[in-house]
Design a protein with these regions (language model features):
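Active-site metal-binding motif and surrounding structural segment of the metallo-beta-lactamase
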Residues: 67-118, 133-135
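Binuclear metal-ion centers of metallo-dependent hydrolases, dominated by the metallo-beta-lactamase
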Residues: 115, 130-146
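Active-site environment of divalent metal-dependent phosphoester hydrolases
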Residues: 95-99, 123-125, 141-144, 158-160
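Short, polar loop motifs at secondary-structure junctions
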Residues: 39, 119-125, 138
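Catalytic core of the metallo-beta-lactamase
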Residues: 42-48, 144-184
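Metallo-beta-lactamase
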Residues: 1-71, 76-82, 177-184
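Short amphipathic alpha-helix with an adjacent loop that forms part of the alpha/beta core around
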Residues: 77-85, 143-147, 165
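Divalent metal-coordination and catalytic microenvironments
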Residues: 45, 55, 93, 116, ...
Length: 184
């Protein structure tokens, strides 16, 4: 069976249909807290204070080159043009499906005032791409943005973007806190 799988070209299981929703279009109160799954690890979060985007990937492939690499199976539920003004973008680690330079550059072009929070070791890549408000975070570091505190926490994972850079930068999770809401 293994040989059949290898030689017959069946590389992935049957596609699973995932129903997406456009209910996000009904959100009208900008002060209302919400989280919208856009796709993969990308969430749009409004914590009643700021708009946060996590690990934005809007590309068709997660790869250093646009024509090869893992292809997106499910399109994002909203496009970048549908997004509200993004105050903060957080990146959990530097794998191509979480740190998508195409998406980050486009978000920066839409709003150069966006703050980008990245793990220690990844700032240089974003600065080289022309982004300006980039802050590196170590584990347990926090940053105040408006009335929100954003904490960078350790998680069990790793970082790697090339052949020889395994764990040369940090990776982690994000904890968002206001006086009314705590979200991990």
């Amino acid at each position: 069976q293994l040989m059949s799988w290898v030689f017959d070209g069946e590389k992935s299981p049957d596609k699973i249909e995932i129903e997406t929703s456009d209910q996000w279009r009904t959100i009208t109160d900008e002060d209302e807290s919400y989280a919208i799954w856009i796709g993969h690890a990308t969430y749009l979060i409004n914590n009643g204070d700021i708009n946060i985007l996590t690990d934005p990937i809007f590309s068709k492939r997660a790869s250093p080159i646009g024509f090869a690499g893992p292809k997106r199976m499910i399109p994002p539920v909203m496009s970048m043009k549908d997004l509200p003004k993004i105050d903060v973008v957080v990146v959990s680690h530097n794998h191509y499906d979480h740190l998508d330079m195409y998406s980050l550059k486009k978000l920066y072009k839409i709003n150069p005032e966006t703050i980008f929070l990245v793990p220690m070791g990844d700032k240089k890549r974003l600065i080289k791409a022309g982004l300006t408000k980039v802050h590196e975070m170590r584990w347990w570091e926090s940053m105040e943005v408006a009335r929100s505190t954003i904490h960078f926490t350790p998680v069990q994972h790793w970082s790697k973007r090339g052949l020889f850079d395994r764990n040369k930068s940090l990776w982690g999770g994000w904890f968002f806190e206001t006086s009314d809401l705590k979200l991990y």
